[in-house]
Amino acid sequence: MYRIVLGKVSTLSAAPLPPGLREQAPQGPRRERWLAGRALLSHTLSPLPEIIYGEQGKPAFAPETPLWFNLSHSGDDIALLLSDEGEVGCDIEVIRPRANWRWLANAVFSLGEHAEMDAVHPDQQLEMFWRIWTRKEAIVKQRGGSAWQIVSVDSTYHSSLSVSHCQLENLSLAICTPTPFTLTADSVQWIDSVN
């Protein structure tokens, strides 16, 4: 089972949470995203299982819960990928101009990824950049790695993992799963509010 849920940080961060959870939220700029992620999780799973953190800081359910999840956010958008199949990774990005995106692609993309960029019309290369970027991030996050490892990932390499991508209006969403799964717009659930 794979479940993909998307929502808005600004809405979900104000949603009711199970007792004591709001008090665990960090202070500062990460607070709203943290609260929105916990709201998505508690809306999707009730009661919300205990959450622990891996070596690189990746949140996970305690070992006695046979479920895995990953959260990602970009701007006001947040995504949750939930699985009972094994470790998962997801990445969401708002497709937007970035001053140094070509330089960044040259620095971290593999030859195969560069070939994908070169295969599309120049007007579509920014979208392709975000498609490749989100795939790479999803793979790194599935492994529980850090963003610094993105340069060592080739999203065109066919491994035992399944990597799938979907563009949803101005959003680029990619997931990495341990078993085959094809991400489509129909497989995504949008949450407007949580009561």
From Swiss-Prot:
GO MF entries: holo-[acyl-carrier-protein] synthase activity; magnesium ion binding
GO biological process: lysine biosynthetic process via aminoadipic acid
Catalytic activity: apo-[ACP] + CoA = holo-[ACP] + adenosine 3',5'-bisphosphate + H(+)
Pfam family, one: ACPS
GO CC term, one of those recorded: cytosol
NCBIfam families registered for this protein in UniProt: PRK10351.1 (NF007676)
Protein name, entry field: 4'-phosphopantetheinyl transferase AcpT
Species name: Escherichia coli O157:H7
Gene name for this UniProt entry: acpT
